[in-house]
Structure formats: C-alpha cells, structure tokens
Design a protein with these regions (language model features):
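Bacterial Sec-exported substrate-binding components of ABC uptake systems
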Residues: 20-101, 212-239, 363-376
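A short, structured surface patch at a secondary-structure boundary
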Residues: 60, 66-152, 158-165
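Soluble non-cytosolic domains of exported or imported proteins
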Residues: 87, 141-146, 162-169, 190-197, ...
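Structured C-terminal subdomain patch of bacterial secreted/periplasmic proteins
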Residues: 187-218, 299-376
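Bacterial N-terminal signal peptides
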Residues: 8-16
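Positively charged n-region of N-terminal signal peptides that target proteins for export
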Residues: 1-8
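Flexible, glycine-rich surface segments
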Residues: 229-311
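Extracytoplasmic ligand-binding site segments that recognize negatively charged/polar headgroups
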Residues: 91, 98-104, 116-127, 167-170, ...
Length: 376
C-alpha cells in the first residue's frame, strides 16, 4: 500500500510539474493577462501576443522573443531570460535587412531608422535613398562589417538583420555583447509569397502602427486574390537570368517567384528544378538543359535584379544568340523585371496581379506595369 501511495504521489507531482510547464508556455508571460493574438493569414515565421497595458510579445521562429513596452508603461517583473525588452518609441534602428525597408516606408516610419546596412545608391526605395542623401539615415556598414562605434554612438536600441547574419554569427554576438539586441527578419523563408508581405504586421506591432499595417497588407491580399480569381491562362513562364559565366540561373520550384507565377494563373517552366538542397533559392542550369526546358515556354521573364536591366530585345539576345530560338522570343512575349523588384516586399500582391496581366495580354499589347516591362 505504501508503494502504491508513493507511486500515486509521484505521478501527481509529475502531473503538477508538467501541467505548470504547459500553462506557462501557453501564456507566454507568467502573471500577465493575455488579451489576444495578432491574426495572421500566411506568415508562419513569427507571432505577436497581446497583453494588458499594451504589452506585445513578438516571437520569431528561431529568432528570439521581444517584449514591446509602450512609452510610459512599466516593465513587468519576472520576464523570462530569453525575452528582450524593447521600449517604444524606437529610434535609430540599424536596418541591415534590405527587404524590410519598404515596410517601414509603407508605414510612414522611416523616422525610426537611423542607420542603414545599405548605401544610398543601393536603395530602390526612393524615400530611403533620399533620407540617406539628406543625412537623416546614416550608412553604418553592411551586415557582416558594421560600424560598431557609429552604432553605439547613435544609441541604437535594435539591429534588424536578415537571415544572412547566420553567416556572420560573430557579428551578431558582438552586437549583443555591446548591448544592441538583434532581431532577425526571416520573411524570405516564408513559404507563401504574401507571407513575406505580412511581416509588415510585425513591424506595425514594433512601432505601434498595427492599423496601418493591416490596411496595407489587406490591399496586397486583395490584389493577389483578384489575380487568383481571374483568368487562368495556363501559360508556361521561364524566369531566369544569364550569369557572367554563361549559365542560366533559375529559381527552384517552390520558391516564392515560382509560387507567384502559379498564383497569377501561369505555370513555372522549371517545375522539376529542385537543385541539390541548401538555402539558396537559385540553381545554375547548363544552357543545353535550359534550352530544352525553356524552348517552348509561352512567356520569358528576364530577371534583371542582380546583373542589371536589359532595356531592349537586342540586348537580351546579345546574352546568348540561341535565345532567339525560344518560342516566346519569336512570339514577342519577352519581359524583364525592374531592378527594384526584390526590395519591394510590400508590393508582392501587385507583382502577382501584374504577372496575371502579362499572362493574359496579347502580343500587340504593352500594359504599363510597375515591376515588369516588355522587351522590344
């Protein structure tokens, strides 16, 4: 009987222990009343839990947790050791995650950024470039070589990095050691294209601009849905660039560009291109294999975001004379991306809508688009 009683007591203690653990995990912050959670439609890389007194707990997948405390509010006691406290208003942020700049710009909050990991001439976000030219945002070195002295001198409360910081872990550790918290923007890992845009809700929570963030995201969602519900052309699209070494560089299937093509009613020509693993979203394709796949594609979209724009069909064909044999070239269905495309995370819904326009327009039509243009 004593053995049975002891066993039952042990089980009860284990149940109490693990039960408390589950309750703490679900609540996020012990002893503080949770009032809600941010609703997300596509993003999977972060969550935002809302607590009394305007507190917000941002949790980033494999990227830490941050407690956002409104101006004038008290910092609660008993915060878990893995939670970094960020007090509003945030000023002089060091932004090294290029994809996030347009989100801050869309929110009208470039004033929160004081330091950039990209030089003025590297920005296709016009307001960011102008702010740097006016000296309102200073260049503080790229993500792998930040100017620690400038960052500390500016009183930087937060460094926002892209996933590339994983290749420079010593830099991240140094920033933390110096008292600068690091938030990793993992929007590029989102499986759905609109998941990238939805990261604007994270920055809305960070800056107290939730309403504006929801409004901007819903605009892009509506554009995407109009494309998804529109004409399904079924046209095959080859999206690529030619590298200096002569390879065709194409996106892996499942990459967000191939997903955008599918959402726009097209079919990605390189649907079997999975590469050999790794984090990169692109694969070098030998020209022989490239031509066998792209020869019958209905539409060709040349990716100019790395090597620069080609402005005419003649310039495009000069990349490789065999490109003239592509069906899309012969039918006048050759398009090029604007160089600004990859810095425009906020406008992915519009890009999908424009792809839908490309797939549905005739060879004699040249619609005015923001992120693509027809080569003539």
């Amino acid at each position: 009987m004593k053995r049975i009683t002891a066993a039952l007591l042990c089980l009860a203690m284990l149940a109490l222990f693990f039960g408390c653990g589950r309750e703490s995990t679900e609540e996020g912050l012990a002893g503080i009343v949770q009032t809600g959670s941010l609703e997300l439609a596509f993003a999977q890389g972060f969550s935002v839990d809302e607590y009394e007194d305007g507190l917000k707990l941002i949790s980033i997948k494999d990227g830490g947790r941050f407690l956002v405390v409104p101006e004038g509010a008290q910092i609660p006691s008993g915060i878990p050791g893995d939670v970094t406290v960020l007090r509003q208003p945030l000023k002089n942020i060091y932004l090294a995650a290029t994809a996030a700049m347009c989100l801050f710009d869309g929110l009208g909050r470039l004033d929160a950024i004081g330091l950039s990991g990209t030089k003025a001439e590297g920005w296709y976000v016009e307001n960011a470039r102008l702010a740097m030219e006016r000296g309102e945002i200073l260049y503080a070195g790229k993500y792998s070589e930040p100017d620690y002295e400038l960052i500390l001198g500016a009183g930087c409360p937060l460094a926002i990095e892209s996933g590339m910081i994983g290749h420079a872990a010593d830099v991240m550790n140094k920033l933390v050691e110096l008292g600068v918290p690091v938030l990793i923007d993992r929007s590029s890992y989102e499986p759905h294209p609109l998941g990238r845009t939805e990261w604007i809700k994270l920055y809305g929570a960070l800056l107290g601009e939730e309403e504006k963030a929801n409004e901007l995201f819903n605009e892009q969602r509506a554009l995407m849905e109009s494309a998804v519900n529109g004409e399904k052309s079924g046209k095959t699209a080859a999206f690529f660039r030619i590298s200096p070494s002569g390879y065709a560089v194409a996106r892996k299937t499942g990459d967000y560009v191939s997903r955008m093509i599918e959402l726009a009613g097209g079919r990605y020509a390189f649907s079997d291109l999975v590469g050999e693993g790794g984090a990169t979203a692109t694969v070098n394709v030998e020209m022989e294999k490239f031509f066998s796949t792209a020869r019958e594609a209905d539409v060709v979209i040349y990716n100019s975001t790395i090597g620069g724009e080609v402005s005419t069909l003649e310039e495009f064909l000069a990349l490789n004379p065999l490109l003239a044999e592509l069906k899309a070239v012969q039918n006048g269905a050759v398009w090029c991306t604007r160089e600004s495309m990859y810095q425009q995370t906020l406008n992915i819904g519009r890009m999908i809508k424009e792809l839908n326009t490309i797939f549905s327009c005739g060879a004699d039509e040249t619609p005015e688009l923001q992120y693509f243009f027809r080569l003539k």
